[in-house]
């Protein structure tokens, strides 16, 4: 039986030497380091050439285009800011002019209203003065008429009293002169 399975010593020796592996991992083999370094150098040079000739110019172009866009946007924003500042100054100037016009219109209207009120006041004073003069004339006429009636009534009353007391008809001139003296005071 031992013959069919082989030599036990040989199997143990073979297994112990290989450790269960056939060969070491290729990158760790010392014999292939030089060829691996050459392959790595060729790969990095090729990658550098591809990146520097194709990718970097595209990225640089994108960056330049983006910078141009940013610069253009900043210039447009500065221009619009200047325009808005100019518009604000024009608005403020127009607003100041409108205030001045409004104040002038207010002053003019105030002057017109004051002049109209003064004219109306003068007209009213003239009408009131005319009415007062007419009223004074009416009062004077009424007083004169009343005084005339008072003289007549006083003369008649005095004549009646003298006739009643003295039994004699008094002289009308003497009676009028006595009544006038009595009225004057």
Curated annotation (Swiss-Prot):
It comes from Rhodopseudomonas palustris (strain HaA2). Pfam families: ATP-synt_B (PF00430). The chain crosses the membrane at residues 32-51. Keywords: ATP synthesis, Cell inner membrane, Cell membrane, CF(0), Hydrogen ion transport, Ion transport, Membrane, Transmembrane, Transmembrane helix, Transport. Belongs to the ATPase B chain family. InterPro entries: ATP_synth_b/b'su_bac/chlpt (IPR002146), ATP_synthase_B_chain (IPR050059). GO terms for cellular component: plasma membrane; proton-transporting ATP synthase complex. It comes from the Bacteria. This is ATP synthase subunit b 2. Residues 1-23 are annotated as: Disordered. It is found in: Cell inner membrane. CDD domains: ATP-synt_Fo_b (cd06503). The gene is atpF2.
